[in-house]
Amino acid sequence: MSLTSWFLVSSGGTRHRLPREMIFVGRDDCELMLQSRSVDKQHAVINYDASTDEHLVKDLGSLNGTFVNDVRIPEQTYITLKLEDKLRFGYDTNLFTVVQGEMRVPEEALKHEKFTIQLQLSQKSSESELSKSASAKSIDSKVADAATEVQHKTTEALKSEEKAMDISAMPRGTPLYGQPSWWGDDEVDEKRAFKTNGKPEEKNHEAGTSGCGIDAKQVEEQSAAANEEVLFPFCREPSYFEIPTKEFQQPSQITESTIHEIPTKDTPSSHITGAGHASFTIEFDDSTPGKVTIRDHVTKFTSDQRHKSKKSSPGTQDLLGIQTGMMAPENKVADWLAQNNPPQMLWERTEEDSKSIKSDVPVYLKRLKGNKHDDGTQSDSENAGAHRRCSKRATLEEHLRRHHSEHKKLQKVQATEKHQDQAVTSSAHHRGGHGVPHGKLLKQKSEEPSVSIPFLQTALLRSSGSLGHRPSQEMDKMLKNQATSATSEKDNDDDQSDKGTYTIELENPNSEEVEARKMIDKVFGVDDNQDYNRPVINEKHKDLIKDWALSSAAAVMEERKPLTTSGFHHSEEGTSSSGSKRWVSQWASLAANHTRHDQEERIMEFSAPLPLENETEISESGMTVRSTGSATSLASQGERRRRTLPQLPNEEKSLESHRAKVVTQRSEIGEKQDTELQEKETPTQVYQKDKQDADRPLSKMNRAVNGETLKTGGDNKTLLHLGSSAPGKEKSETDKETSLVKQTLAKLQQQEQREEAQWTPTKLSSKNVSGQTDKCREETFKQESQPPEKNSGHSTSKGDRVAQSESKRRKAEEILKSQTPKGGDKKESSKSLVRQGSFTIEKPSPNIPIELIPHINKQTSSTPSSLALTSASRIRERSESLDPDSSMDTTLILKDTEAVMAFLEAKLREDNKTDEGPDTPSYNRDNSISPESDVDTASTISLVTGETERKSTQKRKSFTSLYKDRCSTGSPSKDVTKSSSSGAREKMEKKTKSRSTDVGSRADGRKFVQSSGRIRQPSVDLTDDDQTSSVPHSAISDIMSSDQETYSCKPHGRTPLTSADEHVHSKLEGSKVTKSKTSPVVSGSSSKSTTLPRPRPTRTSLLRRARLGEASDSELADADKASVASEVSTTSSTSKPPTGRRNISRIDLLAQPRRTRLGSLSARSDSEATISRSSASSRTAEAIIRSGARLVPSDKFSPRIRANSISRLSDSKVKSMTSAHGSASVNSRWRRFPTDYASTSEDEFGSNRNSPKHTRLRTSPALKTTRLQSAGSAMPTSSSFKHRIKEQEDYIRDWTAHREEIARISQDLALIAREINDVAGEIDSVTSSGTAPSTTVSTAATTPGSAIDTREELVDRVFDESLNFRKIPPLVHSKTPEGNNGRSGDPRPQAAEPPDHLTITRRRTWSRDEVMGDNLLLSSVFQFSKKIRQSIDKTAGKIRILFKDKDRNWDDIESKLRAESEVPIVKTSSMEISSILQELKRVEKQLQAINAMIDPDGTLEALNNMGFPSAMLPSPPKQKSSPVNNHHSPGQTPTLGQPEARALHPAAVSAAAEFENAESEADFSIHFNRFNPDGEEEDVTVQE
């Protein structure tokens, strides 16, 4: 019969009849069950008003509200639902449309008492038809109410539908609170699903409710609603509210919703549900529209096999009756599938679809779709089979329609998809109890795909880049499963291949593939390291790997497709998610979706009927783990997976660690940090372990756990952290086995924990995971550092033990590193507070070996530069590993940590200024951990750090000390700090009085600097020569920027800092090697800096007095402003990080908070003393690092910061510093306008602040030249040091302002870094890099597009200037309005001149605009380099075409053209700088190739040298001009060097040419103004 009834049509097309009674909508025990975590357990009520025949919805005070027509309705108020109203509950992906239509009620349904009552039989006959039509109509409808009459059935159907919707949502992950970032994306999928699902589902709901509508059920099944129904009858009728709902309801619901969303896909999903997670993992593949369904059959699941799976799963689900009812249609579908073997491509496409679309979706969502189990598992294979068969028909038809378009794409990826299906199948197998049929399927699949292993490996590697870790875990579990059963073994192998696609590491990764992966990673913000972790794939899994690779490619291709079919996504989330889809989804979903659905799902999976013992365990546990680690997308769904690629074998981890770095830059720092370190340390071991099959499952698991723990540390890392034992596995077979066992235990525990955590509200899970992640991160780092020592222990250890073992391991690692501070251990305990290298909350015992203590001071000789570099890389990795989730907290922690570190260092120095021995480690860090103190100490710490750095040089390296080490071995810092502190007051007082005093102070400062070598100079320069300090600081800043950039981007509390410290230290050590030449006296300076603590007590009063009181001169006013700004910036870096995190314009942020922070401790610190300045520089470096400033930006920023704070620092000082820094610094410093803007005169300090560009331009060219020229030589540095020392002493007087400026800038940098991390990730990082002068950073972070554009313009100008600086240093210098024009001579002459320019030493403080300019400069330079590279590539291509017919050495040319991939990566955490360097290197190579093409014999070169170059430059197009200019730049302006060449933009090149033609300073400013943010010239004529 039909009756008029109200329906809620979900966006997936599922119609839920609204019973004529009150129904509850929610996640638990509700008639209309929604799977979205954003939906409360009892979310809303839909009541029926019989008098008006209307349904009313009332929100039950839900967290996320109920929305009618996208308007949140008031709580506890009934709102009448009108026709076509759009109803949404929370942020559930199901948008229900209120539809009224006739519903044909099946006779069986009519017989159902409840249904009859509700329907009021008079209308029953037409209800079914109406239902069909309504479901067809309301594809977009997403109503949370289930038909009351069909409450159980409808509820389950709704659950199923909503699951489908939720799957769309859940894969994306709905946040517990707030609108998901992906909101609205699912409806497309839902629409598709609805098309397939709508009719059958409604019938199913109706029939299912009555339980008599077998036909309806069949129809429902056919449309994948049947799949749900099968689940639901099992779940609904037996115990709709009881066990099925609770136990399986969520997964089942998710599955159902998946099915509803993708009915066709859901057919296999029902299989999965019915299969009990086993044989119908293929069903998961079907999660993708029709994929799972076809997958089961296409996966070589004969109907017998399917039946076996179904039979196996029936035990899981008691759906026998339903199964029987559905068997007819299901069998028909299955038979049809078996006979016709609908193209695997169909379900593969579905899988691919789910991959691409659902790749962002959490695995468990995919699983839900595929499984169609409210409980997360389809209990019966039969059900799965029946659902599959029933829904497979519709699904296949739907998919045929849907995927014929996809088919073409999928055909390419078909083999991959098959492999993915295998992976999915194995995943399903893991989930389900049917290992054998699944194994067969997997085997068949793995055998079927004959995709070339290289391509598959490449694709696989791509996917395993993000996939690797999780597949590793899954493979571990799968290996376990292999042990469990032979078929399981096959599945495991397949799963390993699928999940373990990452298992095989491409021995010869395609450079193109790698590049493509990099590009993809970049696109998804995951591109930190160019070395992507490539999965170490077992030979036996190569096929699967191929499949996975193909599927990855398919997933990538389909990523843009709406993943209407999430069935495969489900299984792929389990297995394939581990694979290609994961890597895609990890990035895409990480980028877009950062929710915890995956956690939820994983928990569901853990709680799923199948324990963790089989593939299910692997799929659930392993998948969860892998999901956590490998399937970043899963993580993003479950817990907003950290943007950490799945943990590959450690060998690959190291590669992937870089990728993970990128990912983690957006991800939590700590998580990635640890992972990358671990990966670094144990990649080979992991690889070997992967190769060992016996150990492989566990080792993979461990690795996966480890990698995941590291990677997704914030996700469900506690469990994953057991994976930290992966290094242990890598250590040795024995350790591996032990670790495997322990890890297995730990994994089980973790899984339990995860289940608990996941079952707990998402927020709770997030918190748990976050805490765990931090711990795990730290622990993992230790483990990675010391995999042999702690692995087994760590495996055994669960969360705490892992932490402990990691503490020990970290300690050992620290010992090994000799840079990792004791803080590493504490890092675990106090995740947010502890800095690994910088300090530990707990005060270190004097007993702690110096090696363990990060050297606050630059360990010039303490730690080998290689160690330092290793630490730096580790630190960088670690920082990159930090999870984005914890990035906010981490950023704040990082800033606090930096502040604390500064305070501690200041305190340490204070404590150790008398005793400069290694006792420093025992200094009371706790006392110095005052946030406010930090702010003050932030700057002061550098000063204190000067002393303590030496003392703790080998004990601890703090950012400050590292920074100091870099800036000056740290001794100078102390000395300078001391002199600065005294000189600070004096300066404040004497600044106005006389520069002579400054000169005298500078002389003293120089003495310190000289005595301490170059190291001290930077410290002194902090006060006097911001740039001088900036150079070392820049070096450190670069290092730290590099490290801390990551850290700040992924603030990991102290850990990132520690890592950054270590990293900086390592970098500094590298720099120290260069600086060492200049600063052999570092230790000597230590004693000198004993005085440094003195300013500490007076810092606040002194700085404030200096800022506001005695030194209230105009210069002091500048200093005051600078100090205020610096203060603000320091505060910003320390306290303001949240501000930086805000999306407020950086400019706004910097502007607002600075004023707010005028009285902040930072200002005091800044004005307090040179020490503070040193600290400020250090902090700036930290801030830069935090802000993700790259090496170059750091230097640039630091100098600029210094310029702002201490504009007086002479360029020669900066040059010297640059030279001292060496080529590394040079690269950083080529952009360091600070040298340029570091005017020599105090007037310049004020005036150049306004016109710093010119000054910078003048100075910068020489300085940059010096840097470039003396990069390799320390001699110019020594001479420069003398000058700088003098200048510094003058500058020390102005140090207060400068230091305040520095502090402010560092604060800004921190803010910007935060903003970058939060908002732009990589791009912001670039800005951050350019933002080293924290203003820009803060501004960039805070500034909206317009502000950023302005900044970009600034940057462009700065960038152009930087190019110009190098090109026309003399002109610029001669044009310097200051009396320091003499400096405009040669870089070295300038270096010599600085002494003459003590006035110059009083650099004009750069205005915030200028600082921004630097930030923008870095950003713009980065963009320019990119543009230049692109244009050069284009030009090279064009030239190649032009000259292809000519006789050329094309092999050589092509190799040159491809050489960019071979460009050595500069060790810099600044993605911007490294990217710029890479781009410029590529440009250089391309230009070389172009040169070879154009002028193979050098005739043109000769002509050009004879005088045609001027004609050549203008003649070629801008792109070519840039190349030409770049090409000739070596001859024309060697000082420009690579950085300039890279920076050379077409416009910039022309500008550079003009500058080379001795353009006037006015021209510089014109160029600055002329260049748009793009670097394009606004007015070419102006340039002309």
From Swiss-Prot:
The keyword Cytoplasm belongs to this UniProt entry's keyword annotation: yes
Annotated Basic residues bias: 401-411
Modified residues (Phosphothreonine): T501, T644, T760, T914, T920, T1023, T1058
Residue ranges constituting the FHA domain according to the UniProt record: 23-73
Record protein name field: Centrosomal protein of 170 kDa
Annotated InterPro entries: Cent_Immune-Sig_Mod, CEP170_C, FHA_dom, SMAD_FHA_dom_sf
Coiled-coil stretches: 1467-1495
Recorded name of the encoding gene: CEP170
UniProt-annotated stretches for the region Targeting to centrosomes: 1113-1584
A Gene Ontology term for the protein's cellular component: spindle
Residue positions where Phosphotyrosine is found in the record: Y364
Family of the protein in this entry: Belongs to the CEP170 family.
Modifications after synthesis and translation: Phosphorylated; probably by PLK1.
Keywords: Coiled coil, Cytoplasm, Cytoskeleton, Microtubule, Phosphoprotein
SUPFAM superfamilies, sorted: SMAD/FHA domain
Region (Disordered): 368-441, 480-512, 562-890, 906-1176, 1238-1260, 1325-1345, 1369-1399, 1508-1556
Subunit (UniProt): Interacts with CCDC68 and CCDC120; leading to recruitment to centrosomes. Interacts with PLK1. Interacts with NIN. Interacts with FHDC1. Interacts with CCDC61. Interacts with TBK1; efficient complex formation may be dependent on the presence of CCDC61.
Functional summary from the UniProt entry: Plays a role in microtubule organization. Required for centriole subdistal appendage assembly.
Modified residues (Phosphoserine): 138, 141, 356, 359, 446, 466, 497, 571, 580, 630, 633, 636, 667, 725, 838, 879, 881, 930, 933, 958, 1019, 1059, 1112, 1114, 1132-1133, 1145, 1160, 1165, 1198, 1205, 1210, 1239, 1241, 1251, 1270, 1280, 1362, 1521-1522
Top-level taxon in the UniProt lineage: Eukaryota
Pfam family, any one: CEP170_C
